[in-house]
């Protein structure tokens, strides 16, 4: 009898230990999931992995006597009723030359909306050589109903692209943007709705 009681007690302790270990593992997985996104973003910005462009604060001091084609692609997600396009579909700067291009966005919805742009460069191995000095993608953009906004991008292509083994044969780059609704945006369903009396309610 005493042996059975001891075995039962030992089993309860073992079960509690397994439960605690499972909870610790579960919490650790959640923590790693949250940390993975900013760490991956940082890794992409530093290395140019997955076509992520670089952000710099000064212009290139070397300009090669060689040009490169840069084309532009503009998209919006289904949750953002904007018209978004590049003013010029392609430019042909010298490698190392700092130039400015412009994108236009128009809010077609009846309410003010805020968007944030994600971006990349293809071919992806060229992302590390595409340097942005100024870009609307660095901050969120808010447009009033019917408002059209011109948004500049100032960039240069690093001269090292011409000699790096993986990019020296690249002659055309494509800079792509996609606008998504900002996470801080108030859902349309929760915006005030006017009643027949003119009062607003949620």
From Swiss-Prot:
The keyword Membrane belongs to this UniProt entry's keyword annotation: yes
GO terms of molecular function? copper ion binding
The Gene Ontology biological process annotation of the record reads: respiratory chain complex IV assembly
Disulfide bridge positions per record: none
Q: In which broad location class does this protein mainly occur, judging by the first location in its UniProt entry?
A: membrane
Q: Does the keyword Ubl conjugation apply?
A: no
Q: Name one GO cellular component term.
A: plasma membrane
Pfam family, any one: CtaG_Cox11
Give the stretches traversing the membrane.
17-39
Q: Which family does it belong to?
A: Belongs to the COX11/CtaG family.
This protein is called what?
Cytochrome c oxidase assembly protein CtaG
Q: What is the gene called?
A: ctaG
């Amino acid at each position: 009898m005493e042996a059975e009681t001891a075995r039962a007690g030992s089993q309860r302790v073992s079960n509690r230990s397994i439960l605690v270990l499972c909870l610790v593992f579960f919490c650790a997985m959640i923590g790693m999931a949250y940390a993975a996104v900013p760490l991956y973003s940082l890794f992409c910005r530093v290395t140019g992995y997955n076509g992520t462009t670089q952000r710099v604060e000064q212009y290139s001091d070397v300009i090669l006597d060689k040009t490169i084609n840069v084309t532009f692609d503009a998209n919006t997600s289904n949750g953002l009723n904007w018209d978004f396009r590049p003013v010029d579909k392609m430019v042909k700067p010298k490698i190392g030359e700092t130039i400015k291009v412009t994108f236009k966005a128009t809010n077609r919805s009846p309410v003010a909306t805020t968007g944030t742009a994600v971006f990349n460069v293809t071919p992806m191995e060229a992302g590390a050589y595409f340097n942005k000095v100024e870009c609307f993608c660095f901050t969120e953009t808010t447009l009033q109903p019917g408002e059209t906004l011109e948004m500049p991008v100032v960039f240069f292509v690093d001269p090292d692209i011409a000699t790096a083994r993986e990019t020296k044969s690249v002659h055309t780059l494509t800079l792509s943007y996609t606008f998504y609704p900002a996470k801080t945006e108030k859902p349309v369903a929760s915006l005030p709705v006017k009643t027949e009396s003119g009062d607003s309610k949620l």
